[in-house]
Amino acid sequence: MISMDKKDLTDRRPDILEGAPLHYAPKNELGVVFLFSHMLKKLRLTIDIIQPQYPDCIAYQKVGGGQKKIRIEFEFKSRNFKSQRHNPKGCDWIVCWEHNWPDIPNT
């Protein structure tokens, strides 16, 4: 008989991402940042700053003949933005893996 403890049940692998640079779905914010970095060309973005303080990232998006500054906060779950009490006015995009904040402010 095989015995399983509670840890065995919580250590299951996340979903497989077919054709993505990360084999499995992210389990944390760093995985979100990694996947986002592979979307830069498609989103027409260049990164200016990545930092540990809010906002996590300053990027520029090609728009017409110019560039638009985009302030980005990375979260694994969108609701983490609220629990960290960030000011929504200091951020243009919340990039997350799981959107679980139904009353997200519309700024």
What are these regions (language model features)?
Residues 56, 79-81, 102:
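Short, well-ordered alpha-helical microsegments
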Residues 73-83:
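Short beta-strand-loop-alpha-helix junction that forms the active-site gateway
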